[in-house]
């Protein structure tokens, strides 16, 4: 089986990570590579690590360039994917790495992104209950945001098992690549190095409604979420600490069993040995989530911690995982399980 693939937004971080993974995928042939303002330049000017594709010239992102492929990945800013996807036929699998098709509620879309709701596609966290079945054979897929990916997988089992109250606190430390490649003063090395800072405080981050949507589905009831992202001086990775009040006396061993039961058969989600806590460095370049969970007896709260590479399992790896499901390939095909360390 040979799958011809196009990547729109190939000059960005997500597009580059997609291409890194696709180069190692045994069933993929890489076709059109497109970009916006960087059209006309060679890919190697943006991703010198991608030597096999370095001399490929980036085309304009148009339907004509993207048509005729089996799979099209859209690694574009929010608001740009829907119009392009609408012009691609159902014979093409379209996988959107942006936000356009993640949210179910048009009101949420209008509040957080503005404009008309582009519609909802099957949502790309196969490890959450019921989602793998929707992704199998899908022709359209919405890749989740990086924060909702790790945070949802970190706390969802506790909500699904009824262990905790439906009020969750999430504090997630992230690297700078999550903000994309565009030049921003607060991401300059002089501003970031040697410092950590919060942003999107007080429920202001756009991933908040997506996280609420996921956790409410997992818990079977509305869940309130207080989400605070923290920018750290590292290029990639997210470490999410999620906590919620326990509904009854429960010890760490019982909680751990819930997580092991939830993820015991999942190839990409690893509940670490007892006493070992996740660290972002162990997930770099891998399509994996590392988890640990315990109980704070004095506070009466469950505390769960998850680590992920925001560019791999947090974006591009999830996109390839969903492509595999959509095409009926083994889910792990072409996806690394081993991170890069140190």
From Swiss-Prot:
The active site is at residue 146. GO terms for biological process: L-arginine biosynthetic process. Its EC number is 1.2.1.38. GO terms for cellular component: cytoplasm. SMART domains: Semialdhyde_dh (SM00859). It is found in: Cytoplasm. It comes from the Bacteria. It catalyses: N-acetyl-L-glutamate 5-semialdehyde + phosphate + NADP(+) = N-acetyl-L-glutamyl 5-phosphate + NADPH + H(+). One of its GO terms (molecular function) is N-acetyl-gamma-glutamyl-phosphate reductase activity. The keyword Nuclease does not apply. Keywords: Amino-acid biosynthesis, Arginine biosynthesis, Cytoplasm, NADP, Oxidoreductase. InterPro entries: AGPR_AS (IPR023013), AGPR_type-1 (IPR000706), NAD(P)-bd_dom_sf (IPR036291), NAGSA_dehydrogenase (IPR050085), Semialdehyde_DH_NAD-bd (IPR000534). Pathway: Amino-acid biosynthesis; L-arginine biosynthesis; N(2)-acetyl-L-ornithine from L-glutamate: step 3/4. Belongs to the NAGSA dehydrogenase family. Type 1 subfamily. NCBIfam families: argC (TIGR01850). HAMAP family: ArgC_type1. Catalyzes the NADPH-dependent reduction of N-acetyl-5-glutamyl phosphate to yield N-acetyl-L-glutamate 5-semialdehyde. This is N-acetyl-gamma-glutamyl-phosphate reductase.
